[in-house]
Regions:
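Nucleotide/phosphate-binding catalytic cleft detector across ATP-hydrolyzing
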Residues: 10-188, 206-208, 217, 230-232, ...
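Conserved adenosine/adenylate-binding substructure
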Residues: 275-279
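Glycine-rich phosphate-binding loop of actin/hexokinase-like ATP-binding domains
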Residues: 185-226
Length: 287
């Protein structure tokens, strides 16, 4: 189920001091806010719960932004100098500013991951101080539907909660769980969520690709309901017995789980359903 979650940490590290959540499945879907009023009410409830646990007031919050429309778009900006010279910081800043002017239909740039700069025929991570006549800046723009950020800000404003900073959730996650060595040598971080799966690719300590797929754990839950049960019970079975690496033991009596209505379901049947959908999600990740 879609949930609004909040965690209060301390001393600039992941240290749980307070935690609260609210069911948001009726007004947030695949990370997108569809009802600002209800979202604001849920935020107010979460803040009240956290302040009660902390016995203190919350002045500002850091907010992770994600959602189905979040993705990366490549862009390149070139400048040709009148004569060969030294690339200045001012020129690099001007190229970066021009990159933000790229027209995007119904989308907005949330952040930028500079890739490399090409000076004449040579690639440079830091072009300032390099001699050349032509410079091309390659950028990876992190974009999303303009309404994604707007609705998020409106919800917090209506809840009278001040945002200290908006963080790109997949990037914040990568910074928390990936090592510098992993980012440098190259890796993909796959975050399986309830309604979406996020893929982030890193190489040479730089984000190279980001995409949010509209598939997640809830798809598996809905598949399990085909065994004639409610979604809530399907979710419980998935969490308790689900195992994508499940291998049936060769016994006369197969392992089973018992449903609320007394029926029994073989674990291999349950896990075949889970495995089929998980394979589909992973196939989309690799593609």
């Amino acid at each position: 189920y879609e949930m609004l979650r909040s965690l209060v940490g301390s001393e600039m590290c992941i240290r749980d001091r307070a935690y609260a959540r609210e069911d948001a499945s009726s007004f947030i879907h695949k990370g997108v806010i569809y009802n600002i009023d209800k979202t604001a009410q849920a935020l107010t409830s979460i803040i009240n719960k956290l302040e009660s646990q902390l016995n203190n007031s919350i002045a500002k919050v850091y907010v992770g932004i994600g959602g189905q429309s979040l993705r990366t778009v490549k862009n390149a900006v070139s400048r040709v100098l009148e004569e060969e010279g030294i690339i200045s910081q001012e020129l690099v800043d001007a190229i970066s500013d021009e990159n933000l002017e790229v027209p995007l239909m119904d989308m907005s740039v949330l952040d930028v991951a500079p890739q490399e700069y090409k000076i004449d025929n040579n690639l440079q991570a830091d072009p300032v101080g390099v001699a050349g006549k032509r410079i091309t800046g390659n950028f990876l723009n992190i974009v999303a539907r303009a309404s994604l950020k707007k609705n998020l800000e409106h919800s917090f404003e209506q809840a009278k909660v001040e945002i200290a900073d908006l963080l790109i959730a997949p990037i914040a996650l990568a910074n928390a769980v990936l090592t510098e060595s992993e980012m440098r040598s190259g890796c993909a971080l796959v975050d399986f969520g309830a309604d979406t799966t996020t893929v982030s690719v890193y190489k040479n300590n730089i984000l190279r690709f980001l995409s949010v797929l509209p598939l997640g754990g809830n798809n598996i839950t809905r598949d399990i309901t085909a065994l004639q049960m409610e979604e809530a019970e399907a979710e419980q079975l998935k969490l308790k017995y689900g195992d994508m690496l499940y291998e049936e033991e060769e016994t006369e009596t197969p392992a089973v789980c018992t449903l609320e209505d007394g029926r029994s379901i073989e674990l291999n049947v349950l896990n075949d359903i889970i495995d089929a959908r998980a394979e589909e999600i992973l196939a989309n990740v690799w593609n």
